[in-house]
Amino acid sequence: MEELKELRKEIDRIDEEILRLLNERAKLAKRIGEIKSKANLPIHVPEREREIFEKILRLNKEVYGGVFPQEALVHIYREIISACLSLEKKIKVAYLGPKATFTHQAALEFFGFSAHYTPCSTIRDVFVEVETKRADYGVVPVENTIEGVVNYTLDMFLESDVKIAGEIVIPITLHLLSASDSIENVEKVYSHKMALAQCRSWLEKNLPSVQVIEVESTAKACEIALEDERAGAVASEVAAYTYHLNILARNIQDSGDNFTRFLVIAKRDLKPTGSDKTSILFGVKDEPGALYKALEVFYKHGINLTKIESRPSKKKAWDYVFFVDLEGHKEEERVEKALKELKEKTQFLKVLGSYPKALLQE
C-alpha cells in the first residue's frame, strides 16, 4: 500500500506540472494572438495545427514508445489548441444541424469545444454563412461508406467560390438512447431514416415488437426520448451526453465498416503541409475518349486519384461534370503541371482546394 501511495503522489506531481505548462502555453498563445493582430495576419492557421499534430504523434510513437494511445492524444491536443486559440479569437463555425448530429460531432472533433458553433438548417445555409463571412468555417457531409455521396454538397461547389480547407472522417456508431434506464420500457424507437436503415437488423432481432418511427433528425429523436420514458432514440454518443440520455445498447449499427467523410469549407487557400489532398471539378466535351484523355494526365504525372464522381452540370440535359480527389497539393510541381495540362483538355476546370488529409486516416 505504501508503493501505491508513492505512485499517486507522483501522479499528483505530474498533474501539477501539466497544469503549469498548460498555463504557460496559454500565455504564449495570447502573445502570438497580439502579434498576429498587429500584423493583420490570420489568427487560425490550419497548416500550423497540422504540423503540431504530426510532431506530437511522431514523438509519442518514436520517443516515448506510444504507451499513450494516439487517438486519445489527438483529442487531448485538439482541446488544448482549441482553448488556446479561443484566447486569441473565438473561431466561428457553421455546420449542418441541428446540434448533436454527426456533422456537429465532426465539427467538434476538428475545431474543439472552445469554438463558437452555429447549426444551419440546410447545406446551402452553411455555404452562405461562410460566403458572407458570418462564419470563419463551415462543416458539411460529403460521403458515407454505405449510403454513398451527398449530392447536394457536391452541387453547391458548382455555384459557390468557397474553398475546401480540411476533411474529417468519423466512424458512425449508433446507440439506443432513452430517458429510461431499462430497454424493457421502450415501446417506440425514433430516428432519422438513414440511422434507422443502418441498424434495421439489430432492431428487428432485439426489439421485434417495438414501433419504429422516422423523424427529421437524430436530434429530434432525442428530444422526443427526453420527454417520454417509453421512447427510445437511435443516435450518437455525443447526442446521449448533449440530451442527458441513458445509453441502453451500444454499437447497434449493422455494419462495423461505416464511416462518413465531412468537408471543412472556408474563404481562403491553405499552404502545403506535405500530406495533402486536392479536390477539383471539371467538364469535358460530350465525345468519345474525352474523359479518358482528361484522366490520362494524372497517370502521366504519377498522381493517385482517391475519388471520382459524376454529377449533372444543370446547364443542359446529359451534360455532366466530374468531381475528383487526388493526392498532393496544387502548389506541388507535379500537381501544378498536371492541372495545367488538364485545363487544356477540358471545357472548364475549377480547383476546389488543397487541404491536409484527415488525421489517423492515412
From Swiss-Prot:
Keyword Cell cycle applies: no
Annotated GO MF terms: chorismate mutase activity; prephenate dehydratase activity
EC number(s) stated in the UniProt entry for this protein: 5.4.99.5, 4.2.1.51
Residues flagged as site, Essential for prephenate dehydratase activity: T260
GO cellular component: a single term: cytoplasm
Major location (coarse): cytoplasm
Pfam families (UniProt xref): ACT (PF01842), CM_2 (PF01817), PDT (PF00800)
Compartmental location: Cytoplasm
InterPro entries with a match to the protein in the record: ACT-like_dom_sf, ACT_dom, Chor_mutase/pphenate_deHydtase, Chorismate_II_sf, CM_dom_sf, CM_II_prokaryot, Preph_deHydtase, Preph_deHydtase_CS
Reactions listed under catalytic activity: chorismate = prephenate; prephenate + H(+) = 3-phenylpyruvate + CO2 + H2O
ACT domain sequence ranges: 279-356
GO terms of biological process kind: chorismate metabolic process; L-phenylalanine biosynthetic process
General function of this protein: Catalyzes the Claisen rearrangement of chorismate to prephenate and the decarboxylation/dehydration of prephenate to phenylpyruvate.
Stated name of the protein: Bifunctional chorismate mutase/prephenate dehydratase
Organism: Aquifex aeolicus (strain VF5)
Gene of this entry: pheA
